[in-house]
Amino acid sequence: MAKDEAKGLLKSEELYKYILETSVYPREPEVLRELRNITHNHPQAGMATAPDAGQLMGMLLNLVNARKTIEVGVFTGYSLLLTALTLPEDGKVIAIDMNRDSYEIGLPVIKKAGVEHKIDFKESEALPALDELLNNKVNEGGFDFAFVDADKLNYWNYHERLIRLIKVGGIIVYDNTLWGGSVAEPDSSTPEWRIEVKKATLELNKKLSADQRVQISQAALGDGITICRRLY
């Protein structure tokens, strides 16, 4: 089974494969397919955004008519490329990641797609980069969409900053909010290396559910995504 197929939370691998082959892959742009295949050979390929989750992201970007977006956590750039392809010609995505080396893997495909000019890559930890954006009052409520796939222990810290950067009616999407399904398992069934992030994810999910500033929807796509729409 392909690595991206392994990201699904559905109990039936055949059903997930059916979804990918019937509804996702036929609509996937060739440059995204190329980057997905390149990433497949990376030792940490499981970090990449699942293509079915990416497909939903593309629809959300279109629904909010996104022009200015933020991406926290880039890896090789599958979701970043998807965003850049979806944005209008004068759109802009601020992409934040500590590891430029992984971004460089996908950069040739991004250039080939002709969308590099839409990307402002910041090699930085996310919190100081977000704080820097907030230092400019013009940025408050100035973004349409954000996607977060980074340090899970800091998701809530990211949320408190992004809620100020995203406009009312804008969207924030968090990846990995079901953490391999472990959020519904007893700790005794969870591998030790998953425990710390599992606890942080459980706390995040509880806080997002209680956050009246956003409308939320949690979906079992990829490794679980939570969609937040800012209400005020």
UniProtKB/Swiss-Prot annotation:
EC number: 2.1.1.104
Cofactor binding note: Binds 1 divalent metal cation per subunit.
MF terms in GO: caffeoyl-CoA O-methyltransferase activity; metal ion binding
Necessary cofactors: a divalent metal cation
Positions contributing to S-adenosyl-L-methionine binding: 49, 71, 73-74, 79, 97, 126, 151
Keywords of this entry: Lignin biosynthesis, Metal-binding, Methyltransferase, S-adenosyl-L-methionine, Transferase
Reaction(s) this enzyme catalyzes, per UniProt: (E)-caffeoyl-CoA + S-adenosyl-L-methionine = (E)-feruloyl-CoA + S-adenosyl-L-homocysteine + H(+)
Name recorded for this polypeptide: Probable caffeoyl-CoA O-methyltransferase At4g26220
Biological source species: Arabidopsis thaliana
